[in-house]
Amino acid sequence: MQHESPIIRRKSTRIYVGDVPIGDGAPIAVQSMTNTRTTDVAATVAQIRALEKVGADIVRVSVPTMDAAEAFKLIKQQVSVPLVADIHFDYRIALKVAEYGVDCLRINPGNIGNESRIRSVVDCARDMNIPIRIGVNGGSLEKEIQEKYTEPTAEALVESAMRHVDILDRLNFDQFKVSVKASDVFLAVGSYRLLAKQIDQPLHLGITEAGGARAGSVKSAVGLGMLLSEGIGDTLRISLAADPVEEIKVGFDILKSLRIRSRGINFIACPSCSRQEFDVINTVNALEERLEDVITPMDVSIIGCVVNGPGEAEVSHLGLAGSARKSAFYEDGKRQKERFDNDDLVDKLEAKIRAKASVLDKANRIDVENLED
């Protein structure tokens, strides 16, 4: 069953990306980035909708050219999730997408240009009430910082970030968040820890260029898990060389593991051994695939034998403890009279899980109504 997280989050200011609150205790937002060509409007819209379907709170879109900016205008008209425009080199592109309703501007201090160009972007953002993300990356630091430190260090990344924080402060602009990403876990973690001590603005977390689906997920879970467990972080992106949809799933899994934010089913499943009375692995895989559309937070334990099965089931919303021929079924920690045939588990479990999700959703709605009264 759901348990409260013991994590005490870092205090930060509040900004809004579209209608999504960021910082000051708001739920940690999970975002991804499209990997289509932005000028391919149909493909980009389709990918954004796929990301939104699995729970993306925010989607970032690369806008490298003026042609891409014109495409962004069309994309923005066809989706509802807030969009961040990723801007490098040409500050004029930021000004253009601002006209087209962008929800946030991401600029890279290492290549956006001199202070006068930043001032132009900030003035535009202020006039149109658009927040900015200062996005520092260990692979694209300013030349003078590279020369000063000779290699990326936490101090180098934070100095780059603080240069631009100071510019925004001088321009009296406080609607921004900051990221200091690196592909090395310790470098990224050290950079965020250092930055968290120096500013009050929201922090966007990420291990950049983390790798493929498996290795990148592990690296991100380790790095972001360290920071999140310390209360650091207000938004996150899992950077994978994989389908962006997987980034959202992994992001929510990390938050779910730390009890920070839950979306969908938390399956508690044994790795299986010779004691299993049914095929645990295929059962869990089938249920995960079938139930991707369920967003209700709930714990479901699927354990193949009676050693740990009853204990896990007693602390889950629903649970299955394997036994010969027919397995024991639990609801809200209590064993039910009904038993499930081990050769016909998936359909029955799916039906039970969907029914339980409906009950929990109704209870949550009643709770909210009572609070409003």
From Swiss-Prot:
Q: Which family does it belong to?
A: Belongs to the IspG family.
User: What are the recorded GO MF terms, alphabetically?
Assistant: 4 iron, 4 sulfur cluster binding; 4-hydroxy-3-methylbut-2-en-1-yl diphosphate synthase activity (ferredoxin); 4-hydroxy-3-methylbut-2-enyl-diphosphate synthase activity (flavodoxin); iron ion binding
The note on cofactor binding and number reads: Binds 1 [4Fe-4S] cluster.
The free-text function statement in the UniProt record for this protein reads: Converts 2C-methyl-D-erythritol 2,4-cyclodiphosphate (ME-2,4cPP) into 1-hydroxy-2-methyl-2-(E)-butenyl 4-diphosphate.
Reported EC number(s) for this entry are 1.17.7.3
Q: Which organism is it from?
A: Vibrio atlanticus (strain LGP32)
- An example of a Pfam family matching this protein is GcpE
Gene name for this UniProt entry: ispG
Reactions it catalyzes: (2E)-4-hydroxy-3-methylbut-2-enyl diphosphate + oxidized [flavodoxin] + H2O + 2 H(+) = 2-C-methyl-D-erythritol 2,4-cyclic diphosphate + reduced [flavodoxin]
The entry's protein name is: 4-hydroxy-3-methylbut-2-en-1-yl diphosphate synthase (flavodoxin)
